[in-house]
Curated annotation (Swiss-Prot):
Compositional bias segments (type: Low complexity): 52-65
Function: Involved in ubiquitin-mediated protein degradation. Regulatory factor in the ubiquitin/proteasome pathway that controls the turnover of proteasome substrates. Targets proteasomes to the nucleus and facilitates the degradation of nuclear proteins.
Taxonomic source organism: Aspergillus oryzae (strain ATCC 42149 / RIB 40) (Yellow koji mold)
Locations listed in the record: Cytoplasm; Nucleus
Name by which UniProt lists this protein: Tethering factor for nuclear proteasome sts1
Length: 312
């Protein structure tokens, strides 16, 4: 039976290899992808892949770090705390802020000068707006119905009327020389302040009109002071612009002649206006002077005058 089973033939070189290398262990080579030989087409593909990949150190593809978001961290412990000064001032309106400053100046008198020098200079429009606010308060204080010129109405509006007159007395010196050096600002303020005085109520009782007459007297003195100061600057050229002669004459008419002294001062300063009568019945000399003045302002003076040539 054994003779019938044939053993597979073994090549003779296999036995020779086993006999020669039996003294040392034979290591079987392990297959790795990198150990095999690469073909020419593999080298070309690998080269193309390396060329297509951009290096990480290329300046055109330098990775940029995104800016970190400055997010406020949540406070671990939530507790109440007062507002900071800037946030507190944002919640105050004009009246509340004015009250805070007034209270601080009363408790610390040394702050008065600092506040005065730090605060911006009030303009003509802002000052007149304050006076108009007092005027609106006065008008709203009149009782409904009845006689608005009676003693009862006067007693009802006496305090708002006093507040308006006090504010007028405080603001007027601020816009007078030498505190105000620009005559145009002084004239504009006096124009608006005089209109407010015109709107003051007239009372049946003459004694109640003393305050109104005093206001006209003070504003007339202010007009005279500003006119004299403006006449010293540029030969009174500031008074000739804006039609101040007509405005002052109208104010004098609305006041019942209480500003006549200011009208006379303006006429004396200009030299061509001598009161309201001469405006309607002006002399030929006054008209000639006014015509010359208009020619000087328009730049046409002397265009038709012949010029002599040669010895005089």
């Amino acid at each position: 039976m054994n003779s019938l089973v044939a053993t597979p033939p073994v090549p003779p070189h296999f036995y020779e290899y086993s006999r020669l290398s039996s003294s040392r262990p034979m290591s079987t080579p392990t297959y790795t992808p990198n150990s095999r030989k690469r073909k020419a087409d593999d080298d070309g593909n690998d080269h193309d892949g390396r060329m297509s990949a951009s290096p990480t150190s290329s300046p055109a593809f330098t990775p940029r770090s995104l800016p970190s978001r400055n997010m406020k961290r949540a406070r671990p412990n939530v507790s109440g705390r007062p507002l900071s000064l800037p946030r507190l001032l944002e919640t105050l309106d004009t009246d509340a802020l004015r009250g805070v400053l007034r209270s601080m100046c009363e408790r610390h008198p040394g702050l008065v000068d600092e506040v005065v020098h730090t605060a911006p200079r009030p303009s003509v429009s802002s000052a007149l707006q304050v006076l108009r606010n007092y005027q609106s308060t006065l008008q709203s204080s009149f009782p409904l119905g009845g006689n608005p010129a009676s003693d009862y109405a006067y007693n009802r509006v006496r305090q708002p009327l006093s507040n308006l007159l006090d504010a007028l007395s405080d603001f007027t010196p601020h816009f007078l020389p030498p505190n105000e050096i620009q005559p145009s600002l002084s004239l504009n303020y006096l124009d608006g302040a005089t209109e407010i005085i015109h709107a003051l109520p007239r009372w049946h009782t003459p004694q109640n009109n003393i305050e109104r007459d005093s206001a006209y007297d003070e504003i007339c003195k202010a007009w005279i002071l500003v006119i004299r100061e403006a006449a010293k600057r540029g030969g009174g050229i500031q008074l000739q612009y804006g039609g101040w002669d007509q405005k002052l004459a109208k104010h004098n008419q609305n006041s019942g002649g209480k500003l006549q002294a200011a009208v006379n001062e303006l006429g004396a300063s200009l030299g061509w206006m001598h009161g309201p009568e001469t405006q309607s019945h002006a002399s030929p000399g006054g008209n000639d002077f006014g015509s010359i003045r208009e020619q000087l302002l328009s730049g046409t003076y002397g265009l038709g005058t012949p010029v002599k040539v040669g010895p005089w």
